[in-house]
């Protein structure tokens, strides 16, 4: 199965009539493995800051999480494993696996919990398979 299939079928899946607005699977170096068509163009330093927060949980809290130039307020997640962010009626969830970052971006009416569930389901599967 291609990485694009994981994005299209597992991250952009429908949950209770809603779905993520965009999603991606990135290498921990910021290389794009697969992404949805509307995933924001991010800067390398944004991925570096995200990876730093996984290494030192809470480092993004004072400045916020930036992805594609959009600032998200970091909310409490699972230190070292999940970084959730909020912006207005939407937000982002990022899970770190052994080799990748799974990123889901959502808008209302999807809830943060639904986004977390989608991202964590794929992320946990990849962790279980060693990726």
UniProtKB/Swiss-Prot annotation:
Signal peptide start-end: none
Subcellular location as annotated: Cytoplasm, Cytoskeleton
SMART domains per the UniProt record, alphabetical: PROF (SM00392)
GO cellular component, one term: cell cortex
Cited Pfam families: Profilin
Lineage top rank: taxon: Eukaryota
Gene3D superfamilies: Dynein light chain 2a, cytoplasmic (3.30.450.30)
Keywords recorded for this protein, A-Z: Actin-binding, Allergen, Cytoplasm, Cytoskeleton
InterPro entries: PFN (IPR048278), PFN_euk (IPR005455), PFN_sf (IPR036140), Profilin_CS (IPR027310)
Quaternary structure and partners: Occurs in many kinds of cells as a complex with monomeric actin in a 1:1 ratio.
Family: Belongs to the profilin family.
Function: Binds to actin and affects the structure of the cytoskeleton. At high concentrations, profilin prevents the polymerization of actin, whereas it enhances it at low concentrations. By binding to PIP2, it inhibits the formation of IP3 and DG.
Protein name: Profilin
